[in-house]
Amino acid sequence: MVSIRVICYLLVFSVLQVHAKVSNANFNSQAPQMKNSEGLGASNGTQIAKKHAEDVIENRKTLKHVNVKVEANEKNGLEIESKEMVKKRKNKKRLTKTESLTADYSNPGHHPPRHN
């Protein structure tokens, strides 16, 4: 009984190894075909990894371009607002809106400003 079980396990193990070798061989032969179709309907892990690698490279190029633009603006003398300056400007804008909303509109000729 034990020997039959061992033989079955060995048989299953050998079948799985043969299947892995065959599927790996088929995978390598199909890779150029998928490359020509530009990955339409592809579910290969390598193609997904390549796509992610391309995205990372593109993002790095974009970040590099943004950094170059910031450095160019600094060289041209354009002032780049710091977070504190932006915060102050937005706070000032918010306060002026609050003042206009709480203003006394009892005068019939006075119309409230439009806030778009």
UniProtKB/Swiss-Prot annotation:
Residues modified by glycosylation: N44
Keywords for the protein's UniProt record, in alphabetical order: Differentiation, Glycoprotein, Growth factor, Hydroxylation, Secreted, Signal, Sulfation
GO biological process: cell differentiation; cellular response to phosphate starvation; maintenance of root meristem identity; positive regulation of cell population proliferation; positive regulation of gene expression; post-transcriptional regulation of gene expression; regulation of asymmetric cell division; regulation of cell division
Residues annotated with Hydroxyproline modification: P113
Induction or repression: Not regulated by auxin. Accumulates in both root epidermis and cortex after phosphate ion (Pi)-deprivation.
Disordered: annotated span: 82-116
Propeptide: 21-103
Protein name: Protein GOLVEN 11
Natural source organism: Arabidopsis thaliana (Mouse-ear cress)
Lineage: Eukaryota, Viridiplantae, Streptophyta, Embryophyta, Tracheophyta
Gene: GLV11
